[in-house]
Each structure stands twice: as structure tokens, then as C-alpha cells.
Amino acid sequence: MSGRDSRGAGGGGGGHQPLSNAMGKLKEKLTRVGDELGYHRVESNLSTSNTATSLDTILPEDPFLFPQVSPQRHPQNTVRTQRLLEDEPPLSFRPLLEDDDINEPPTQQQQRTPLRASGSLELTPLPPPPTSLEIREHRDRQQRGAQGDDLQRSKQSLKGSRVSFERRDTGNSNTNSNKAAESSDEDSFEEKRTGFQQQKATSVDHKGILKDLKHILANDNRRQFQAKKHVSLDVKGTRFLQDLLKESSSEEEFHKTRREFQGRKHQSLDPRVTFKLDKVLQGSSTDSDEEGEDAEHKRLIHRPKDITKPVIIDLKDLESESDEDFLTSRQHFQQQRSISTDSRKSRRLYEMDEMGNKRGENIRHAVPFVRQITEDGKPKLEVYRPTTNPIYIWTQVLAALSVSLGSLVVGFVSAYTSPALVSMTDRNITSFEVTQDAGSWVGGIMPLAGLAGGIAGGPLIEYLGRRNTILATAVPFIVSSLLIACAVNVAMVLCGRFLAGFCVGIASLSLPVYLGETVQPEVRGTLGLLPTAFGNIGILLCFVAGSFMNWSMLAFLGAALPVPFLILMFLIPETPRWFVGRGLEERARKALKWLRGKEADVEPELKGLMRSQADADRQASRNTMLELFKRINLKPLSISLGLMFFQQFSGINAVIFYTVQIFKDAGSTIDSNLCTIIVGIVNFFATFMGILLIDRLGRKILLYISDIAMILTLSILGGFFYCKAHGPDVSHLGWLPLTCFVIYILGFSLGFGPIPWLMMGEILPAKIRGPAASVVTAFNWFCTFVVTKTFQDLTGAMGAHGAFWLFGAICFVGLFFVIIYVPETQGKTLEDIERKMMGRVRRMSSVANIKPLSFNM
């Protein structure tokens, strides 16, 4: 085709003759194609490209791309054709002008066939055919590389062409000779179009394959990460760290060996063998290090061929010195943990040998240590849990008994006003007058002073020490009781009550701290009940003694109770943790020797305390008070405050403080002092019932039971007092107030008594638990003050029935508060609770709760 350009440009007049012949044949071929294939011309301005490549725009009909057009209507299709050709990738084009088109003259049939189109073409007479020399020169030009230029011009001509053809549906049948002439061109076009469609489909499939591949790789990486994370918490690994901690001489050595151990565990997930899921792994017999390492991987990991099935990673072979079966070890570990935490098995247990004889070794010490992971990822080791030392129960019982005597004094002081106010307001016994308003202050000033004592107790236990702070409350307790016993006016009574309340606030904060830092975890559950039990004993003792003594003699008894408490406090040491916090390592060692036994190896536990204190010092610079006001912390703080509010405004302290007066006003046929004793006994035993049921029924179930019981009893009590004042005679129902009070105390002790304090430690975030607990405790004391101070005013203004109905209505609102806002925390870890409450978690993992590793990859 480019040869024609050369001839037309440089041939002069004679050179135009072959070009005219070629153009004539081209027009003739165009006419023949249009007739035989059933196409008609839409545009009259045919592009006369020398290469004639525009004829490639004669597209066969495709039902998926072009609509059917009837013979009568032939709309222009130039825009759609041009856009279609521009969007498609460039294809290879070939000229339609063949050698036989040049050498073969047109037939008369072809010359007579007109081109059916909207615009006619004027056909010129056919020129003579080209000579053989011109044909040879044309072929030489094609061989010298003119095809590339022709192809480029063909593409440009194709893009700029505005010629479009539509299929004309005619009934005329074409001759077999015309079909044979055009079959090669049509087949070539169909082949190119099919190839293009295949190429496009392949491109789409390629993108989908890449997307699926990325998804598969992402899932595989996620499974590997989860596997590594779970492997690091394996029980066998924890036991290794336990032995490692005892053998390490420094913190750096422990961390170094720990990293090496974790590296060994993570090698079981080496990517070199992770994807070889289609091979059966067997040990290697070669001596090279690399093959030996691979054999070790294969020996440690047992993977199924299907990666969707659960993968069990057995780490029992990580410790070369341990050849105990993993399942047996796991069962043994669970038994040890159950024994150490079950209060019903608190008696001394012994291991049995194969013959069933006692070995004489206490196995409760086998509980692993609690490992806390701080926010920066470093391990925080609390008081060293595992020890081979026997548990010297008597020394720790002595320490717990000493501080629990302080709790007995607290209970006695709290219940003092209930039996004492009856005789104190009697002018035949008291030399000074105690008005109703003064009596309300006698009962209400103690919780107000307890609020101040709780705030002051926090700094005191840090500066003076836990033991010294508790010891410092003994003498003020004695002085406060003597002030009340020797009082000659109401002011002395109020001063004594205020001083006693201040000591109560300090003791309520420092007693549990001392027990938590001195008693071993194996007996902490049992000994931790002593303060609560002794507090209830103090309340019962006050009720019993108050039935036989007046307010002055009862105060003298209260002054005598702190004396054994004071003596025993001199016998016990300060907590080792406080000594470590002050840098007194030697004194901490002596304290541990006293608590654990002279022959005990206390060095590992002492090192654990020092590490824990170092971590606490790093966190001490953070201002946690500002964290209380963040939005994410307001929900758990509000729930704790709400529980404390409904606990106190259920009227419990009003009932405890004014039990005798309430029974006198009720006109019960049972002696009022006997009624208070019965209430004290019920309160004592109901506390232990709540402890037994709280982990079996759940927190919310017990809160429901407690709230419903208090609502019913308070409503019945209100109705009883209303009928007594305004309605029919109820003297024959003298047993009803005592029955209601017993059920009321029982319901309170099951739920709203212990659970608000328990849930305060569960739902408050770890980062703000200290300051938040102080705020909640102070709020509890404030509510106690309001209830006890205003109870007599309420009964005077609304009547006893109005006060009890008010408390019942508050309990009714509290029931809906529990249903809507209070979460269930039974069986959940602190991480799960914090994640649910705040949406984030601070990792605090106890390996005692870890189950054998089995997870899905």
C-alpha cells in the first residue's frame, strides 16, 4: 500500500495511472462487499486513506453490541462506532488490498453493481492494470519495512474514520462465489474479536485471582499471629517460667532466658514449614544443623492437611527434662488449682504415693504465680506465688486475727446507737437531756466522721505503714468510748462518736490492705473472711450486751474491746511490701521470715516484691485523678456510685442503728432487745450464705432476690405502721415486724450488702481503680450519714410508715437500675469485664485460668 504512495508521488502523469486503477478496484471491492454481505452505506464522506484500512470498520452484526435495525430505518451509527473503536485496545490490521486485487481486472458483473447508499458515488472508467514492474516495486517496498508505517497510518485512519455500516436485512441470496471471496476477511475479523474478548476476560479473571490470593495470604498471616499469641500463654511454658524465676539471680538474666524460651516456642510456627501442609512430617536422620532444626519443628508440630481444621500444638516436648504426658500434667495442674482455691478443701492435704501412703508434703503451694502484663508489654510479677515452703498457718492466722479484732471494734461502734439511744433518752437513767434532734446526730455523726477518716486513711497507710496505721486507731477507739461512758452532756457524746467514726473510716481502708499483703494466696480466701465475720460478731455482741446494759456501761464495754486488739498488734510485723517500697530490704526479709517460717526460702518472693515495686514506681508518675472524668470511665464509675446509693438508701443503717426503737414503736409482743439479738444473728449467718451463693447464682440474680425481698418487707412494714397509727387494730400481729426485719436483713445480706463492694473492684478500670474506689467509698459514707441523720426526722414528718414506704420506693427504682445498667460479671475475667464496659482492656492474665492450647487456624 505504501508502494502506491510512492508511485503516485513520483511517477508524474504516467505514475497516476496505476493509482487510479488501484482506487477503482478499491471502490469496486467496496461495492461488492456491501452487496454480498447485506451492508449499506450510512455516510457519504468515505475516508480515502491510501491504505484503505478504514474498511475494517465494516463490523459484522453482534446481537450483544448493536441493536437490530430494520431495512426501512437506517439511523446513523457514527458516534457509537467511533467510541467503541476508541475504547477498544488496538488490534493488528491488515490491508484489504491484495495482490490479486491489483492483477485481476474487475468483471462486468462487478462494474454493473451499484453501491446502495444514501449518497451515490460517481464511478470512473477503469484504468489499465498495473505493469509487472510496478507490482515488483510495490513488493520490494513492503519487504524493506514499510508495513510498520502502513500499520500506524491504518490505526490513525481507523480512529478518525466516520464510516459506519449497518446490516441490511434483505431476502436476496448471495452467490456461493461472493461468499467464498469474503469468507477470509470475515473469519479474520471474527478471530480478532474473539481474541480480544478472551484477552479482556482473562484480565478480569487475573484481577479476581489476585484479590483472592491477597485474602488467603492475609488469613494465613492472621492465623500464624494467633498461634504465636496463644503459644506464649501455654501452661507448660508458664511452668518453665516458674522454675526459671526461682533460678534467676537478676532481672536481666530472667528476661534474657525468657526471651530465649519464647523463641524456642515460636520456632514451632516457622514459615518454612507452615505451608507444607501436604506432606507427612517425620523426623530427619541427617546430622546437619539445618536439617536437625527442621526435624525438631516437624516433631513438635502436628498439623492436618486441611488448614481449616483445628490445629493442636503440643508443647510438651519444649522442656527436654520433662517427659510427663501433657494430658496427665494438665489434669494434675487443674487438681492443684482447685485444691488451692476451694475453701471447702482448706484442711491440710497430702500427696499420695503409688501405694497410697502420705508423703507429708503439702501440695497447696503448687499454684502457679499470677503474671500481670503491663501496658508496655513487660511482665509484672506480683508477690511470688509458687514456693516449696510449708504454709505456717498459725503465724498468718495470728496476723489475720489481730487485725480482725479491729473489725470487731468497728462493728460494735457502728451498732452502738441502736441499743444505747433507748436508755440515753430516758431521763431516769441519763442526767442530761437528749432531744430527738440530738439523738439523730448521735447516730449520724459517726458515718460523717468515717467519710473524713477514709480520705485520711490513704496517705496514712503510705507514710506510717499498714500496721502502724491500724495500731494508731486502737487508742482513739478507747478514748472515744471513755468519752461517751463518762459524758455529762450531749457534746461529749458527739465528740466520742466523731472520734470513733474517724477511726472506723481509717480501719475500714487499712484492714483489707494489710491482709492482702501478708497472707499467702493459698489461705487468703479463708482468712479473708475473718474481718467480715468479726464485724458481724461485734454487731451481735452490741445487741446482746445492750439488752442488759445501759448506754454508759455499754460504752465501757466498748472501751475494753480494743485492749486485746492493741496487744496483738504489737506482735505482728509490718507488711513486707511496705518495707520494700521504702527500700528496707533487710526488714522486709525478716518480716517474710516471720510470716513464712524461719526455715523458709523467702528470696524468690522478696525478688518478686522488688520487681513489682519497681513497676509500680514507673507507673506512679501518672495523674490518675484526671482519668476519672474521661467519658470512657464514667459508665463503670456511675454504676458503682449507683449501687452504693441504693445500698444505703434501702435503709439498712437506719434499721441497724435504730432497731430497738423501731420495735418499741411497733408495739411488738416480743421483747425489743430479743428482737435485736435475733436480727444480729440473722445478719451474721446471712453473710456466709451470700458468700456461698454469689459464685453459683451470679451477681444480678442475687441483686434481684435481695431487692424484691426488701421491697416486699419494707412495704409490709409500712402497711403495719400505717394500720397501727390510722387503721384497724394490729396488736395480734406482733410477730409481723420481727418476721419482716429478719427477711429484710436476710435479703440485704444476700445481695445489696456484699455485691456493691465486690462489683466496685470488678467493673472499675484498673488504671483508675485506686482513686475511683476512694470516691465510691467516700460516697457510701456520705449516704450513710444522710440516712442515719434524717431517719428520725423522716419518721417525725412522714411517720414510720412513710419512711419505710420511701425506702421501699427507692428499692423499687433500684431494681430497674440493676436490670438496665448493672452488668453480669460472674465467671468473667477482669479483661472481659473491662472490654465490655469501656471497649478496651488492660491485660492482666492469670495463668491459673489458662486452658490447654487448642485453637483454629
UniProtKB/Swiss-Prot annotation:
CDD domains, sorted: MFS_GLUT6_8_Class3_like (cd17358)
InterPro entries linked to this entry: MFS_dom, MFS_ERD6/Tret1-like, MFS_sugar_transport-like, MFS_trans_sf, MFS_Trehalose_Transporter, Sugar/inositol_transpt, Sugar_transporter_CS
Extracellular side: 414-440, 495-497, 550-552, 658-673, 722-740, 792-801
Comp. bias intervals (Polar residues): 69-81, 171-181, 330-341
Residue ranges that the UniProt entry lists as topological domain Cytoplasmic: 1-392, 462-473, 519-528, 574-636, 695-700, 762-770, 823-857
GO BP terms: D-glucose transmembrane transport; trehalose transport
UniProt keyword ATP-binding present: no
Entry keyword Membrane: yes
Membrane topology: Multi-pass membrane protein
PROSITE patterns listed in its UniProt record: MFS, SUGAR_TRANSPORT_1, SUGAR_TRANSPORT_2
GO cellular component terms listed in the entry, alphabetical order: plasma membrane
Biased composition (Basic and acidic residues): 134-143
Family from the record: Belongs to the major facilitator superfamily. Sugar transporter (TC 2.A.1.1) family. Trehalose transporter subfamily.
UniProt cross-references to PANTHER family, sorted A to Z: FACILITATED TREHALOSE TRANSPORTER TRET1-1-RELATED, PTHR48021
Its biological purpose: Low-capacity facilitative transporter for trehalose. Does not transport maltose, sucrose or lactose. Mediates the bidirectional transfer of trehalose. Responsible for the transport of trehalose synthesized in the fat body and the incorporation of trehalose into other tissues that require a carbon source, thereby regulating trehalose levels in the hemolymph.
Name this polypeptide is given: Facilitated trehalose transporter Tret1-1
Species this chain originates from: Drosophila simulans (Fruit fly)
Taxonomic lineage from the root: Eukaryota, Metazoa, Ecdysozoa, Arthropoda, Hexapoda
